[in-house]
């Protein structure tokens, strides 16, 4: 039976979906069968990031509304034979947590991992995704605004009593950590009271000015 992991964040623009895709590719590369379910209904972009948007014939909405079976809606990632994407689509009615869980539970026996890309924040879409998961990865950046929202997410996740919750700190600039301009990933994990699973560096050399507020208040 698959491990069901929700990848979430308190704030948009922190790289959550990109990290979900990269995680899926890494797991698939070691031989695991992985499906990434885009739970950001109506604002889905996991298929775009994976480069399969033109290959999507059916999506999560179609499965829930009975137009196809779950396996028919999966699109294979072009870089891996073991990694599949389930796009969310735009449903004609509100998708309930129970309906989404039914779909993902149906897929779980065929896969080693079910990754659930949650909408940012703690709205209804977040709760729908969290209700389907057994584990969570919270993605944040060192920006103070991102940390504040990640704190809200971790607080709410505790109410779900998941088996495991871990943190990924994205867009980290080591020079600013060394200079004391921003909190280190370890300090961030301690503040949020959640184990640190991974650190990803800032790739483009651009770091928003608000980041320097993370340590100074």
Describe every region a protein language model picked out.
Residues 2-39, 107:
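Walker A/P-loop phosphate-binding motif and the immediately C-terminal alpha-helix
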Residues 108-125:
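Glycine-rich phosphate-binding loop used to anchor ATP phosphates in small-molecule kinases
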Residues 123-144:
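Inter-motif core of Ras-like GTPase G domains
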Residues 147-163:
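Conserved C-terminal guanine-recognition region of P-loop GTPase G domains, centered on the G4
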């Amino acid at each position: 039976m698959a491990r069901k992991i929700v990848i979430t964040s308190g704030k948009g623009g922190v790289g959550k979906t990109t990290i979900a895709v990269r995680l899926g590719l890494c797991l698939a590369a070691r031989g695991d069968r992985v499906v990434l379910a885009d739970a950001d209904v109506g604002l889905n972009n996991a298929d775009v990031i994976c480069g399969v948007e033109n290959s999507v014939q059916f999506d999560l909405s179609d499965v829930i509304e009975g137009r196809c079976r779950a396996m028919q809606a999966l699109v294979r990632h072009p870089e891996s034979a073991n990694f599949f994407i389930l796009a969310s689509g735009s449903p004609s009615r509100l998708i309930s947590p129970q309906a989404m869980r039914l779909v993902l539970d149906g897929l779980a026996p065929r896969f080693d991992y079910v990754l659930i890309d949650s909408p940012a924040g703690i709205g209804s879409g977040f709760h729908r995704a969290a209700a389907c998961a057994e584990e969570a990865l919270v993605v944040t950046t060192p920006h103070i605004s991102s940390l504040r929202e990640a704190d809200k997410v971790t607080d709410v996740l505790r109410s779900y009593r998941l088996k495991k919750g871990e943190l990924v700190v994205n867009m980290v600039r080591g020079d600013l950590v060394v200079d004391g301009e921003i909190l280190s990933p370890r300090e961030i994990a301690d503040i949020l009271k959640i184990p640190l699973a991974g650190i990803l560096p800032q790739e483009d050399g651009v770091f928003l000015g608000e980041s320097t507020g993370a340590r100074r208040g």
